[in-house]
Amino acid sequence: AGGVKKPTTLSMIVAAITAMKNRKGSSVQAIRKYILANNKGINTSHLGSAMKLAFAKGLKSGVLVRLKTSAGASGATGSFRVGKAPASPKKAKKAKSPKKKSSKKSKNKSNNAKAKKSPKKKADSN
């Protein structure tokens, strides 16, 4: 039962905000209405709680930004915009380079060990 993987609630919220193109941000009610209209098979009884969790996760990670006009609001209230995504590719490059260095060192050690063993064998044969 591989089926089609449904998008996450956060990705549906981001898609709704970008599609509405509202300069003053998009309200939670408008986002909910857009998601229900454009995504089939959404469980309406669980959408409210899923949206609350997605808004909290999006605000914490910086994917979503609450507008200054609704700064006093908490939870899934007020207006939201799409924030700037954090730059993660730089971290991936740094993680790859030390692994390459360690593999080079291990190759050199194995070559040195082989070179030391071969003269001993010649000495034994004499």
Curated annotation (Swiss-Prot):
BP terms from Gene Ontology: cell differentiation; chromosome condensation; negative regulation of DNA recombination; nucleosome assembly; spermatogenesis
Keyword field: Chromosome, Developmental protein, Differentiation, DNA condensation, DNA-binding, Nucleosome core, Nucleus, Spermatogenesis
Subcellular location: Nucleus; Chromosome
GO cellular component, one term: nucleosome
Record region (Disordered): 74-126
Tissue: Sperm.
Biased composition (Basic residues): 90-120
Entry-linked Pfam families: Linker_histone (PF00538)
Domain H15 intervals: 5-84
GO molecular function: double-stranded DNA binding; nucleosomal DNA binding; structural constituent of chromatin
Predominant cellular place of this UniProt entry's protein: nucleus
Record's comment on post-translational modification: OE2 and OE3 are produced by post-translational cleavage of a common precursor.
Domain of life where this protein originates: Eukaryota
Function: Linker histones are implicated in chromatin remodeling and/or transcriptional regulation during spermiogenesis, the process of spermatid maturation into spermatozoa. Protamines substitute for histones in the chromatin of sperm during the haploid phase of spermatogenesis. They compact sperm DNA into a highly condensed, stable and inactive complex.
Protein's UniProt name: Sperm-specific H1/protamine-like protein type 2
Provenance organism: Ostrea edulis
